[in-house]
Amino acid sequence: PINKIAKSVTIVSDGFANFYNQQFHGAGVGIPVFSIRTRNSFGVGDFADIPMLVDWAAKVGLKLIQFLPLNDTNGTHTIADVLPYAAISAFGLNPLFLCLPKMGKLSDDNELMKQYAEKQAALNASPLVEFMDIIGYKYAYANALYYQEKENFLNDPDYIKYFEENKYWLVSYAAFCALRDQFGTSDYNKWGDYAVYNQG
């Protein structure tokens, strides 16, 4: 009731919110992608392992899947980069979760390709996540694949479309990563003249 003299409102409530019964209710699972390790993984779960989790969740009647952040956390190229909430980009995904075979195959004479099966078996057998070994190999693999395939993918219509749709963040993200690697830190305050991004 409204007290007209004191111009105040008194609210009486039992403390319970009443919702319509039609609201969605569902059980789910929260999981970091690196925990979805399969025999096809490379020491950690990756993006290609997610469909199997989705199939399992549907089979057991779960309605929701929540992942720990998937964003790039590689700010120092050290073990500190393992923290999922220390993202350096709101858009860039963490290379830790790359599925190397889905990216493309290196030539058979490439040293990384020769090591792949043995390295994969060792990393998958480890009871721990060998973060530095995994991310180091994945960066090296991606870099080698880039130089092997750059003429092909730079002219690929799917790549061109992706770049055009995402260049609003992709160019500045690539510049950030290049400067991070050049200066050895993601702290842009230590980049001297490059501390302020200039789109021009």
Q: What is each model feature region?
A:
Residues 14-200:
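Acidic/aromatic-lined carbohydrate-recognition and catalytic surfaces
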